[in-house]
């Protein structure tokens, strides 16, 4: 049995809260945007306000979004955008594995670092435990890339080992951002066949909404380096390097959840979406392990006439998880 809260967790939580307090002004968002959202869709304003209050990330306008239904479509666009970088590149991923995808990206990162671009990389210590060499972060630094490992894996019994960084974020110059389910490994772009044709999705944002993703990275950078990154925030806002207006209609609100508080923002957002659905709920997920509250919401939506469909892989990458998924 493990009792109490780890001291490491307490220190991390306090440091994170200090960063939040010191940078609150950068995440106030636009009251005019919130007012327009309220006029366009009161229900969405309520959802947006919840996200803002409990994840601290505001809603934005002036942002375009492009959806990629497989990694094969996303990868060439990512490469193109990386090659255009002039000021900074922030990359944060759970899994990085050597191969066509990573070597292509790494070559660009090295080139950009030599050009004076601020290139930073965060990868998860457990996610990359068997895919990257030991002390790979030191190799990255030798190549001019600022690199940190999130929660480096240590073979000891410690509850903190369960805290993992599953994010997939790439931010370029503050106004171009990629996220989704695609890690930096060849199977995600179907250059390597592991479990049939690999389907994971991604989204590219361009515009003011990318600021939320930049802030997420800077907060994490402050945590893994145990430094004060609050002074960095003003240097990376979207309009610092892009003085012109951004195109785009509608609203975007990238956000993240945190293990350092008791508010399950991610699940609550999904529950709100499902409970407010009127026509359909379509879910595509590699793993389906849900609690009673989520199951009740999905079943109630279906019983109320909403078209509820869930698609999961037919070829599993984790057999135990696959069995649990089938049980639902």
Language model segments and positions:
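N-terminal localization/anchoring segments of enzymes in phospholipid and broader phosphate metabolism
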Residues: 1-268, 272, 276, 300-303, ...
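Active-site metal-binding loops of divalent metal-dependent hydrolases
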Residues: 182, 286-287
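Internal, well-ordered alpha-helical scaffold/interface segments
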Residues: 275, 296-299, 326-327
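Phosphate-/nucleic-acid-contacting segments
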Residues: 280
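Helical hairpin unit composed of two closely spaced alpha helices linked by a short loop
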Residues: 287-308, 313-318
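C-terminal structured domain segments across diverse proteins
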Residues: 315, 324-328
């Amino acid at each position: 049995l493990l009792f109490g809260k780890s001291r490491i967790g307490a220190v991390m939580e306090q440091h994170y809260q200090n960063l939040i307090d010191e940078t609150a002004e950068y995440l106030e968002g636009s009251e005019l945007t919130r007012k327009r959202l309220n006029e366009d869709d009161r229900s969405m304003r309520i959802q947006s306000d919840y996200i803002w209050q409990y994840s601290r990330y505001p809603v934005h306008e002036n942002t375009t979004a492009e959806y990629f239904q497989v990694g094969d479509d996303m990868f060439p666009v990512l490469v193109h955008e990386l090659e255009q970088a002039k000021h900074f590149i922030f990359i944060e991923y759970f899994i990085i594995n050597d191969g066509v995808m990573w070597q292509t990206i790494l070559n660009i990162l090295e080139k950009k670092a030599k050009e004076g671009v601020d290139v930073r990389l965060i990868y998860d210590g457990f996610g990359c435990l068997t895919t990257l060499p030991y002390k790979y972060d030191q190799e990255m630094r030798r190549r001019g890339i600022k690199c940190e490992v999130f929660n480096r894996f240590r073979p000891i019994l410690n509850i903190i080992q369960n805290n993992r960084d599953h994010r997939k974020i790439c931010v370029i110059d503050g106004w171009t951002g990629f996220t989704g389910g695609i890690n930096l490994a060849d199977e995600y772009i179907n250059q390597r066949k592991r479990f049939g044709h690999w389907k994971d999705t991604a989204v590219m944002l361009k515009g003011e909404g990318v600021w939320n993703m930049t802030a997420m990275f800077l907060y994490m950078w402050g945590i893994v380096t145990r430094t004060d990154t609050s002074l960095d925030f003003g240097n990376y806002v979207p309009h610092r390097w892009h003085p012109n207006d951004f195109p785009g209609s509608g609203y975007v609100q990238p956000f993240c959840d945190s293990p350092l508080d008791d508010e399950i923002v991610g699940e609550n957002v999904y529950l709100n979406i499902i409970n407010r659905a009127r026509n359909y709920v379509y879910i595509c997920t590699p793993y389906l392990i849900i609690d009673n509250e989520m199951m009740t919401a999905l079943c109630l939506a279906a019983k109320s006439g909403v078209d509820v469909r869930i698609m999961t892989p037919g070829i599993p990458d984790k057999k135990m998880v696959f069995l649990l998924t089938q049980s639902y």
